[in-house]
């Protein structure tokens, strides 16, 4: 936090993006107020059964819901650089400089919960957030004992989720096309080099 504050005081012009699981304490987020420009949280489930089974977090929905509310309190509407601000900042026009983009990674077989996540986000926040519906789930070897997760999301499942979002009226959204469910999209989490 101190480094970002110092960089901003010295003229940092690019937006600070906080990439988070979404499972955050509100107190932590309050400490980031005025530091983070764009929040990029995940919102995985509404159903506590899935949250407990796949994330060992039966309180996932309540914790993430409260965290997201705090993020939106800090950034109640998306902001983008216009031509003048882009010139001043030395960055491209149309770059998000404030706001919240909520990512939902669709899991195989959980279309009903994906729809519940999209419905909750849109009914609660409307166009004040962006919703990114992701289809890049890639089954890794450690899920071979969880049969329902041991496959990719089908095109049909994903298309139904996207159609559902469009039917609700979601316009501030992102979708994925093409072959995004590959191991090459997964960063290495070996912890090498960390102390």
Describe these PLM feature segments.
Residues 1-38, 48:
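Conserved Radical SAM active-site core
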Residues 3-10, 35, 70, 74, ...:
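Alpha-helical structural signal in soluble globular domains
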Residues 5, 26, 30, 65, ...:
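Amphipathic, non-transmembrane alpha-helical secondary structure
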Residues 22-26, 43-61, 100-102, 107-108, ...:
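Conserved radical SAM core fold
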Residues 33, 55-58, 187-192:
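Short low-complexity, flexible loop/linker segments enriched in glycine and/or proline
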Residues 33-47, 130-137:
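Non-cysteine beta-strand/loop elements that form the S-adenosyl-L-methionine
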Residues 57-76:
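Glycine-rich S-adenosyl-L-methionine
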Residues 79-195:
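Auxiliary Fe-S-binding modules of radical SAM enzymes
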């Amino acid at each position: 936090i101190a480094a970002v504050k110092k960089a901003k005081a010295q003229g940092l012009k690019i937006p600070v993006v906080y990439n988070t699981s979404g499972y955050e304490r509100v107190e932590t987020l309050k400490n980031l107020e005025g530091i983070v420009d764009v929040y990029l949280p995940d919102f995985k489930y509404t159903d506590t059964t899935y949250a407990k089974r796949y994330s060992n977090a039966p309180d996932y929905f309540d914790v993430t819901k409260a965290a997201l509310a705090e993020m939106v309190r800090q950034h109640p509407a998306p902001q983008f650089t216009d031509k003048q601000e882009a010139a001043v900042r030395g960055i491209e026009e149309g770059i998000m400089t404030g706001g919240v983009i909520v990512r939902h990674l669709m899991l195989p077989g959980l279309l009903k919960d994906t729809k519940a996540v999209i419905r909750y986000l849109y009914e609660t926040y409307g166009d004040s957030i962006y919703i990114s519906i992701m289809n890049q789930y890639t089954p890794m070897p450690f899920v071979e004992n969880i049969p329902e997760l041991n496959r990719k999301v089908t095109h049909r499942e994903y298309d139904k989720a996207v159609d559902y979002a469009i039917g609700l009226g979601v316009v501030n959204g992102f979708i994925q096309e093409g072959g995004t469910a590959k191991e090459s999209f997964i960063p290495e989490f070996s912890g090498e080099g960390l102390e």
